[in-house]
């Protein structure tokens, strides 16, 4: 069977279109969060930055209001990392990845758990969290008093991997970098607490927001395994393509796949964003030479999309009334690209530092 081959650049434009990065969307915040299958939210400000680059008219206050009124919530889901989900989605996503989270705890923390009983620790942790919200550090310290042979971190993470713990305000909202307060989802979101999401629905939703994609891409995003079973079950609903490296790619027939030469605007990303973390093959979002030059998981700066790919990193600093944005390119930029980065960078810096008096944007010269 001969399949149409899609280049990395074609895949890039398809991803940008679905991720609302070709043009800002007029979707509401909760609808955008749901469509994207949640936003990576390791740092307090990450979801705000990710949504500002995707939605027209986005404001800090609008997302904070949804966090406070419990329409969206931040908890550990895909890949064992923090994500911001809608209240309707959180339980379903968490239920699907629960086996992975429990296995991750066992692989990383069982040796640090001493001779303690997991069920007893879990029961004691639930009692503590039902009394009042706690930071992870305080939870581990409190449990250590009763379970002395375990390291505090192994105790608190056991609760985070076995219970859906939500990070609640006033922590983890814009500008608040303090240690997050945790509570059980049952103490924060309204019932029902059984909101099943099927693996087949997960595949459909992934393809809508990230396709065309391979089975390896899907599994990298969520850390579920054997999704080939669900893909086979959807065979009649999907179309197939082939990637440059010979992988079979799956997609929804009516999903957008723009031309490879579709113009792509400059966009600023948070430090962690599923637009590149949600794939096994990240060459749709980074040039080969840049992938070899930078380490996505060590000393990596938040990314800047230039002509659709992550082509630079950014740093924002503040000294009294002066806000400064410094952009470090990963390869040589054209003069036109520099002007585009400066223009979008000025708007981005004003979003990041609303109360500054002076704004400075500098695009550094590329240095090999």
Each predicted region: which residue ranges?
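Long, low-complexity intrinsically disordered regions
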Residues: 1-276, 280-282, 288-368
């Amino acid at each position: 069977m001969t399949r149409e081959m899609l280049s990395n650049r074609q895949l890039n434009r398809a991803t940008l279109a679905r991720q609302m990065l070709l043009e800002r969307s007029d979707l509401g915040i909760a609808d955008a969060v749901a469509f994207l299958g949640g936003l990576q939210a390791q740092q307090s400000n990450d979801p705000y930055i990710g949504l500002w680059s995707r939605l027209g008219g986005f404001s800090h206050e609008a997302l904070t209001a949804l966090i406070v009124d419990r329409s969206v919530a931040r908890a550990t889901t895909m890949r064992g990392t923090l994500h911001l989900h809608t209240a309707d989605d959180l339980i379903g996503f968490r239920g699907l990845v629960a086996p992975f989270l429990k296995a991750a705890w066992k692989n990383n923390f069982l040796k640090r758990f001493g001779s303690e009983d997991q069920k007893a620790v879990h029961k004691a942790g639930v009692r503590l969290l039902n009394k009042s919200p706690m930071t992870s550090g305080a939870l581990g310290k409190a449990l250590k008093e009763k379970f002395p042979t375990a390291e505090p971190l192994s105790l608190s993470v056991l609760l985070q991997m076995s219970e859906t713990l939500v990070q609640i305000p006033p922590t983890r909202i814009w500008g608040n970098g303090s240690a997050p307060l945790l509570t059980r989802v049952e103490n924060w979101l309204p019932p029902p607490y059984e909101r099943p999401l099927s693996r087949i629905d997960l595949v459909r939703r992934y393809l809508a927001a990230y396709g065309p994609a391979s089975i390896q891409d899907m599994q990298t995003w969520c850390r579920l395994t054997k999704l080939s079973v669900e893909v086979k079950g959807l065979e009649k609903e999907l179309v197939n393509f082939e990637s440059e490296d010979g992988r079979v790619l799956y997609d929804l027939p009516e999903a957008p796949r723009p031309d490879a030469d579709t113009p792509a605007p400059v966009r600023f990303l948070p430090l962690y964003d599923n637009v590149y973390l949600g794939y096994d093959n990240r060459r749709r979002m980074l040039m080969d030479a840049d992938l070899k030059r930078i380490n996505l998981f060590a000393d990596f700066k938040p990314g800047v999309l230039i002509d659709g790919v992550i082509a630079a990193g950014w740093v924002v600093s503040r000294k009294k009334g002066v806000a400064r944005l410094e952009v470090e390119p990963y390869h040589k930029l054209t003069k036109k690209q520099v002007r585009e980065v400066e223009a979008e960078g000025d708007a981005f810096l004003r979003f990041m530092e609303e109360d500054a008096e002076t704004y400075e944007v500098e695009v550094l010269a590329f240095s090999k």
